[in-house]
């Protein structure tokens, strides 16, 4: 009886593993430009808290991957290049707080030295949660 229950639970876990969303979302940055830049990201962490964090720096003519620990296929993205010029990206705009230094803000925290920036909403579809940002 114990073996049947264990086997049944294992089969159920394997079945659910195929339906549950991944706990990580990869953002691939492919910058072919002569200027480097920075990203700020807002996403729902696996513990259920929205977090806005920055800055993920990328160099000129570089490629790198950022992994977000999240169950959600939706995140928000803000991009700056060349020392702070915002990049206008197409998409649904939302305003969130950022700080010039490296930061991580939970929920709707409003930092003392912060400013609001335009983020675009990105929704990733498919079984393999990844997004590629090309410049």
Task: Give the ranges of each region predicted by the language model.
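Short, Lys/Arg- and Gly-enriched loop/turn segments at beta-strand edges
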Residues: 72-78
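Short, well-ordered beta-strand segments in beta-rich or mixed alpha/beta enzyme
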Residues: 8, 78-79
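Intrinsically disordered, low-complexity segments enriched in small/polar residues
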Residues: 21-47, 51-60, 65-67, 79-135
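N-terminal signal peptide c-region/cleavage motif recognized by signal peptidases
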Residues: 17-19
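Bacterial N-terminal signal peptides that target proteins for export
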Residues: 1-9
């Amino acid at each position: 009886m114990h073996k049947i229950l264990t086997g049944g639970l294992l089969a159920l876990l394997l079945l659910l593993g195929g339906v549950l969303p991944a706990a990580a979302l990869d953002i691939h940055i492919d910058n072919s430009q002569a200027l480097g830049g920075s990203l700020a990201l807002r996403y729902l962490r696996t513990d259920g808290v929205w977090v806005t964090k920055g800055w993920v720096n990328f160099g000129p003519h570089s490629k790198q991957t950022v992994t977000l620990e999240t169950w959600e296929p939706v995140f928000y993205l803000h991009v700056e290049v060349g020392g702070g010029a915002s990049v206008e990206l197409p998409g649904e705009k939302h305003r969130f707080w950022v700080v010039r230094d490296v930061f991580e803000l939970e929920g709707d925290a409003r930092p003392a030295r912060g400013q609001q920036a335009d983020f675009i909403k990105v929704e990733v579809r498919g079984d393999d949660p990844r997004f590629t940002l090309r410049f």
